[in-house]
Amino acid sequence: MAEQYSHDKVVPDTASAESKKKQVAEMFDDIAPRYDFLNRFLSAGIDVSWRRKALAKLAPLNPKLMLDVATGTGDVAIMAAKQLRPEKIIGIDISEGMLQGGRIKVNAKGLETVIELKSGDSETINFPDNTFDAVTVAFGVRNFENLEKGIGEIYRVLKPGGRLVVLEFSKPKLPGVLQMYNLYMGLVAPQVAGAVSNNKKAYQYLNNSIQAFPEGNNFVAVLNKTGFTNTSCKPLTLGICSIYCGDK
């Protein structure tokens, strides 16, 4: 049985009796129209370079068939189509609102024959074993209802010799930077994002889930436990984001 982690129990609305999965899907449906704008604004655009660096970890594999888990509005899938030029990318997400926004972007860029965005759950990925050459997850593993189960499913659908690349928020280690980060993520970001999206709880949840997530070596240990090899963690931008890799 998959182990439970403290972050698995972090939810957008603690007063709700709904499951984390259902709450997260509803939350992203609600903020979907402003999601891309807030991503660029709150990160000052640096999230684009983070995605590019993460995808560079897949370049040596020259993947032909890719899966993007928690694809959201398709930012990683679209960038991967241009940067890695695979034959096909499947993006899955539990939020139909985010997928609708992603499909509009994919069609606008003429990538509809390369990228397919569809409803899908990380914990029950609807593909056979050993299907994909590479799997990506950007800012999504924190939202898994059961982290270990989701990572195990990714391992299952990845081909032998394939690679998982995860991009996820982490906490800086330098004391002065950590205090500034906590102030920004705990107070400033929820206030600003709440005013723009009319959903302050979504960005309070963002901070709470970052604080609870088993980052760094702890997440590498999860990858190792589920069978991945050659695992690694590379912090970016003073440690506020990290790239994790694991091979099957």
What are these language model-derived features?
Residues 222-248:
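C-terminal lobe and adjacent flexible extensions of AdoMet/dcAdoMet transferase-like proteins
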Residues 123-134:
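A short acidic, Gly/Pro-enriched loop at the edge of an enzyme's catalytic core
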Residues 65-124:
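Class I SAM-dependent methyltransferase SAM/SAH-binding core
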Residues 167-222, 226, 232:
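C-terminal alpha-helical "lid/dimerization" subdomain adjacent to the S-adenosyl-L-methionine
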Residues 35, 135-136:
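Hydrophobic beta-strand segment of the Class I
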Residues 34-37, 44-65, 79:
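Conserved alpha-helix/loop element of class I SAM-dependent methyltransferases that forms part
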Residues 1-26:
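N-terminal auxiliary segments of SAM/dcSAM-dependent transferases
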Residues 148-163:
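A short glycine-rich, Lys/Arg-flanked "PGG" loop and its adjoining helix->strand segment in the class I
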